[in-house]
């Protein structure tokens, strides 16, 4: 962002990047395996428009796709961001906000960023720094337990055998766990230190265990939008790590991923898929966020290029040989949609069209004139590959005034085969199931 852009943003939080129609329509060409990549837009003033966080009115809820029923599985949480379902059916919710990162909020730009995040529903309160356990003791009755507390902006969770792992913003910790535990009281063991520091621009650290239980995969976001803090600040970032559970040692599994968040296994191919947030301030329609099957050792462009070999000439220290090898992603998810949550579905408690593919939680845009995201979509798969356009699963997070009643983040499939969605503005976990097959009453 330029100084001029920063100075104009607070007046209305909707700075127009160019003299173009404010209500331009953006179509499905932003999604799929072959998105239309328009020329980037350069302007003195950056586009900033974010839906003001409002929360749900009494009785309010998002709209499920035809053939589904939406219920509140749990309410009155504190900024629920991420979900994990234990083998016994207990649901874990990471309640988390950004950690202190003083060097990511200096100057006018930092102050504006804080204002934008506050408007979006983030940063208004200190991080809960805990994981809450939700146990459905009987249909319509959900117990709430503080499973872990005193954490540091936790996001990722994984269970391997009798060991429970948590990805804080600065480290992966482990705790002993036994089936049925509602609280973990043992002191943690630090497995691996993660990149953090005083910038820690993309602070969330996602976590996924390998099917054989030997490794953990961690999504580590960049320390900037497009390398403006210098490449030294990006050491070991913008990557998915592979951690050896026995030793805690890590290696870079894939790199050039600006902000890799959601991680999921595709069972037919055995591929590791990731949802990635791409860079900002190149225009309303580029580059798209995406999901892709990661190649071991693959480089995906950031910060030098996007979507293969599309050069970002704002990055002055280019690396042509690395760009030449940049892997183009598999499936575009729309520009600036903030596609975060990712979960494979083979659920039996959903309509048949949602039973083979990936659910994606789209937190919603701040960097385009027409709001995008703010919904949960489903991408169908055939033979291990995405096919066809996405299907809206959960919408209605924006009201008629474009205020955010909620914002979806993490997604997971529960032990009944229904979809769970963490809503960090509504402070709710929503449950989406096949109409006529729901087994619980609405949480109050």
Segments from the language model and where they lie:
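Beta-propeller domain segments
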Residues: 18-64, 102-104, 110-121, 126, ...
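Asp-box/WD-like beta-propeller blade repeats and closely related beta-sheet repeat scaffolds
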Residues: 142-162, 168-210
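Short coil/turn segments that connect the beta-strands within blades of beta-propeller domains
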Residues: 88-89, 161-162, 212-214, 270, ...
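Beta-propeller domains
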Residues: 88-139, 180
